Amino acid sequence: MNQPLQHTTVLLDEAVHALLGDGDAPAGTFVDGTFGRGGHSRLILQRLGPQGRLVAFDKDTEAIQAAARITDARFSIRHQGFSHLGELPAASVSGVLLDLGVSSPQIDDPQRGFSFRFDGPLDMRMDTTRGQSVAEWLADAEAAQIAEVIRDYGEERFAGPIAKAIVARRTERGPISSTAELADIVAGAVKTREPGQNPATRTFQALRIFINAELEELQQALEGSLRVLRPGGRLVVISFHSLEDRIVKQFIAQHSKEVYDRRAPFAPPQPMRLKALERIKPSTDEVAANARARSAVMRVAERTEVPA
């Protein structure tokens, strides 16, 4: 039987250094947008000054339970997705950290339904207290809808055949309720396999992203960060696949240049609101020690003096 993996935080030191800067014991309010199991939050608290404050967000009830064990008065957590960080007071935050990866305890718990490696209920919700599970959505979705999700969020070229196979199995045997059943359907529909990759990888990724509205939440969080970051505040984002990184890259690029209004060619341009600082990949040593770091990309930007 596969044993659950202990979660190892990716780019831990690099992310916290980028967030807090070089100063000793910084003050100010910082945001950890994805508490997970607290890897980043605990290190931030170690390096934060006595007047500092850390606000964490997470949708996962198990993460909220883990956070309850932190008794530091400088720390608080909200049972919300990071898309809500824009509700914090404007220009009140010195740094925002978004780690977009799914934690190992989530992936490796069969009852959460995130992985094709373990047979369990086909759920995949980050917050199991609300919303549809993947099984519930697949029970009613049309083939065209399923194909669109798998193609757009998984970049899967066999999205059409996979969707047809899902609907055919559902029609023949009833709703698809387990991860093993879905993985078996996908394996039968994918005609060629990428070396070293399970044929269900892209489909599971796509359904997880869709059911949790991950890309929409990311866009909202990035927009919210512009509102809450004070001038000089840092935005640090760790992404794990090309769809996420593309959104982050484009967002930083969009706000790192002056914007002219074509309808008013003589009006002064809107000044840039972010300054791109770094793009960091895990070291070869980190990837060797933690295979899940392989696809990680960290981008760092700094809020300019211009108000939101």
UniProtKB/Swiss-Prot annotation:
Q: Name one GO molecular function term.
A: rRNA (cytosine-N4-)-methyltransferase activity
Signal sequence span per UniProt? Answer: none
Biological process (GO) annotations?
Answer: rRNA base methylation
Residue positions binding S-adenosyl-L-methionine = 38-40, 58, 82, 99, 106
Highest taxon of source: Bacteria
Catalysed reactions, as listed in the record: cytidine(1402) in 16S rRNA + S-adenosyl-L-methionine = N(4)-methylcytidine(1402) in 16S rRNA + S-adenosyl-L-homocysteine + H(+)
Q: Which GO terms describe its cellular component?
A: cytoplasm
What is the main EC category here? transferase
Cross-referenced InterPro entries, in alphabetical order?
RsmH, SAM-dep_MeTrfase_MraW_recog, SAM-dependent_MTases_sf
Keyword match Metal-binding: no
The compartments listed are: Cytoplasm
Q: Which cysteines are joined by disulfide bonds?
A: none
Keywords (A to Z) from UniProt: Cytoplasm, Methyltransferase, rRNA processing, S-adenosyl-L-methionine, Transferase
UniProt main location, coarse: cytoplasm
- E.C. number, please? 2.1.1.199
Q: What does this protein do?
A: Specifically methylates the N4 position of cytidine in position 1402 (C1402) of 16S rRNA.
Q: Which family does it belong to?
A: Belongs to the methyltransferase superfamily. RsmH family.
Q: Which HAMAP family match?
A: 16SrRNA_methyltr_H
Name of the molecule in the record: Ribosomal RNA small subunit methyltransferase H
The scientific name of the source species is: Acidovorax ebreus (strain TPSY)
Source taxonomy lineage?
A: Bacteria, Pseudomonadati, Pseudomonadota, Betaproteobacteria, Burkholderiales
Q: Which gene encodes it?
A: rsmH
